[in-house]
Amino acid sequence: ETGADIITHESFRMFFDPTEPDDVDVETAATPRVPFGDTPWGGPGHSLPWRRKMYYKGSSRFPTLFRAPKPTIRLAEGEHISLAGREWMAIHTPGHTEDHLCLFDPEAGVMLCGDHVLPTITPHISGMTKNVDPLKGFFDSLDKVGAFGSQVKISLPAHGLPFENLALRCDQIKEHHVGRLDKLRVVASELDKPLTVTEYSGHLF
């Protein structure tokens, strides 16, 4: 251990860790944490490599051996925290994950945008959420950080190089998704029959 703080949003949970805090409601605690069953969109379950399956099963049987580092600081939307001599504001940005968190330094105009906004690719939008429309939630989060406009001078992503004009990149990502949705509508109209997510993917890629 290094003693470094691990900062997360207040709702952060490790879905495969049965040793998470006791404040989780009974229904959630009773729900299997590993996505071996049906997917949220109704298709067949994931087929994981045997090594990965053994890891997940081991983590539930021997939690002390597989325990992930615990967050030491949990932040709510709009909370401020001092890091490395800078004052950062927490921005909750559900989309890639339900508990994704960005940090903004208004004095220097620096946005730590993590996996929320990436410069050359679009983040995966998780279906492992209670949100009935996670893509809409992602769009709302893009609008939230995009609204900072020129206040953001530089954005630091989790993948790729630092980039400028965060608001423009947010618009580009939304346009990409809208284009994909339009293509799905065309496919649905042409085939005129129900399709699974897997079948739709075959027409998209």
Model segments located where?
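Metallo-beta-lactamase
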Residues: 50-73, 87-181, 187
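Short acidic, hydrophobic short linear motifs in intrinsically disordered regions
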Residues: 191-205
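Generic structural signal for secondary-structure transition and capping sites
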Residues: 21, 147-150, 193
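Short glycine/proline-enriched coil/turn segments at helix->beta-strand junctions
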Residues: 2-4, 106-108, 193
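Active-site HxH/HxHxD metal-binding segment of metal-dependent hydrolases
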Residues: 1-82, 169-171
